[in-house]
Amino acid sequence: MEAMGEWSTGLGGIYTEEADFMNQLLASYEQPCGGSSSETTATLTAYHHQGSQWNGGFCFSQESSSYSGYCAAMPRQEEDNNGMEDATINTNLYLVGEETSECDATEYSGKSLLPLETVAENHDHSMLQPENSLTTTTDEKMFNQCESSKKRTRATTTDKNKRANKARRSQKCVEMSGENENSGEEEYTEKAAGKRKTKPLKPQKTCCSDDESNGGDTFLSKEDGEDSKALNLNGKTRASRGAATDPQSLYARKRRERINERLRILQHLVPNGTKVDISTMLEEAVQYVKFLQLQIKLLSSDDLWMYAPIAYNGMDIGLDLKLNALTR
């Protein structure tokens, strides 16, 4: 108990020294909130006496009493909890006697305090943001569903149109083939000695679209007229003017005529032979002609005439290469 008494008396002396120092310090400044220096000294002394009675249980903070551009006033003696400061929240409302005065100041940590209205507006805005996002997502889903349904309807309509066009074209192809079969009957031409049958015309199948159907009928009628004009009285077909003037067609015609003449000669040599017999005969003839050419070259040369009997017996000793070198 004696130690506690000594400690309380020591604290009382410290409080009195701080109170005297603060009275001297604050007396030199003007009070911005309308308070006088006498009032502040009175409050400080009252605060000091109250603290000395509580045995140091309530400490006077130096930060709240320092002059930082706003009013530093002490609470009344009747209230016990207004002197405590929070470490995170600094208020800017202070009671001077029975009157209250609001002083605009920044926080001790350097952060500015926002009014309650702006805090409420920000809270409402943050609450409304998810609602707006939900509405936008629902609108986008509805729009995508509408577009997908439109695309499906368009695809179905295009498929139906394609099927209808295919059905029409198939019907027209069937009709054209029937007309060609009717027109492709056998035609007979009379000769001086008798009648000769001509080959029936093959049915022509043509597919045309809706726009080309009208022009196709006229084109077929023109072709029938040209074919009828090309038929001669003797039954021989004559080439049209365009084919007659083409040089490739003339060359092909002459080549066919030559081949036919040679085949007739071979048929006379082998009257009852087939195509295989004629081909083998031609190969043997070619080999015999080559043998004769070799014999003539060997016998006509002064250096190689002695090899003629060896080549005659069918031995290949590379004489063909030597003969080619000599001729060069």
Curated annotation (Swiss-Prot):
Q: Which CDD domains match?
A: bHLH_AtIND_like
Task: Could you list this entry's UniProt keywords, alphabetically sorted.
Answer: DNA-binding, Nucleus, Transcription, Transcription regulation
Keyword hit for NADP: no
Matching entries from SUPFAM superfamilies are given as: HLH, helix-loop-helix DNA-binding domain
Q: Which domain of life is it from?
A: Eukaryota
Q: Where is the composition biased (Basic and acidic residues)?
A: 220-229
Which terms in the GO cellular component ontology are assigned? Answer: nucleus
Q: Record's InterPro entries? A: bHLH_dom (IPR011598), HLH_DNA-bd_sf (IPR036638), IND-like (IPR045843)
Family annotation (Pfam families): HLH (PF00010)
Does the UniProt entry include the keyword Signal? Answer: no
| Locations listed in the record | Nucleus
* GO terms for MF: DNA binding; DNA-binding transcription factor activity; protein dimerization activity
Q: Domain (bHLH): give its ranges.
A: 243-292
Chain positions covered by the region annotation Disordered: 145-248
Family assignment? Belongs to the bHLH protein family.
Tell me how this protein assembles: Homodimer.
Q: State the name under which the record lists this protein.
A: Transcription factor bHLH84
Which organism's genome codes for this protein? Answer: Arabidopsis thaliana
Native organism taxonomy: Eukaryota, Viridiplantae, Streptophyta, Embryophyta, Tracheophyta
